[in-house]
Amino acid sequence: MDLNDTPEQAGYREQVRRWLDGHKAQAPPASGASDDTAYIDARRAWQRRLAEGSLAGITWPKEFGGQGLGPIEQVIANQEIADARVPGILDVIGIGMLGPCLIAHGTDEQKTRHLGPMLHGDEVWCQLFSEPAAGSDLAAVQTRARRDGDGWSLTGQKVWTTNAQFAAYGLLLARTDADVPKHKGLTMFIVPMDAEGVTIRGLRQISGEAEFNEVFFDDVRLSDDMVVGGVGNGWGTALTVLMYERLTIGLGSSGMGYRSDRFAAAVGADPAASRDPDVRRRLGDLATELLAIRFTSYRTLTALQNGQIPGPEAGLAKVTTVNAAVAAGELIADVIGPDALAEDSEWAYLISFLPGLKSAGGT
């Protein structure tokens, strides 16, 4: 496995870098409050700029507005965006996970209606899978969709739903047949988040934000054209989302957007910490872990690039990335102290939010 860019990849990296150099002055801050409407609007506008600059939907087929490139180009773009200290796309869930599901399983009408607005940030999407009694055991979902005339009536609850508070649509897994084995009685639906009967309640985190939500459905009416992948085929459709979810979480972050030299600089700024043997050991462990994550991610990318199905390393990427994030946050908090959680600190997001990704995408 060659870890260097090919000439074509090096050219693509330079193209991305030039675009970012020319546009990053218009970028909003890399992080902000999820309940700040002005910030979310700025992120939508930035995603539109990224799409216009061919930096959104990089792996989507060209016929749906994407670039038709491979996962390696996606990682190159992620790396350059992180190095430029600008935010990436706002709707990672939509473009990284739900859009590919619609491309694979959606009707022509669904693709035409939703993929363009999703790509340009006009429609943000959320994933309506987890329930209070159905997390990693996803097939145990109890949210019910029953036939009601020529449509469906949806009743139930979802939890830990990221971005539901400003999403236009959600992709929801519901039980449509309780008389068959649990994996067979499921159907996937598109749900307008402003539909009558939908209630969204934020879940406050240690960071003070409420990026996760509970979502309640009380006799929500859905038309038959909101079914994705066919009635009773929800489990297979959900597996497509889950595959892209693990890849998005594990590979899309490219080391959480942090490189070991940034942690070394933070430690080096404190003379006492930089001489502390335990701090130096922890920094060395973290640098090794980040390098291992990157190399393991490259193994997955190489398999995908060669048309192969990645092995367990694809799922492990998510787990190891989050574990490294927790270790990194603890190291920075110990070295910098309370100032690391200040509102304008570049480390606040790492320390207070990323540990929550332990639950994201299943455990």
Predicted segments with their positions:
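A short core secondary-structure module
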Residues: T155-R201
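Alpha-helix capping/hinge segments and adjacent helical runs
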Residues: G22, Q67, L242, G315-T363
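Loop-to-helix element that buttresses phosphate recognition and phosphoryl-transfer chemistry
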Residues: R281-N306, V322-N323, A327-D334
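A short, Trp-centered hydrophobic/proline-enriched beta-strand micro-motif
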Residues: G121-F129, L173
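Amphipathic, small/basic residue-rich leader segments at the start of a protein or domain
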Residues: M1-L90, R113-H120, I249-G250, A265, ...
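A structural signal for short hydrophobic beta-strand segments in well-ordered beta-sheet cores
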Residues: T143-R146
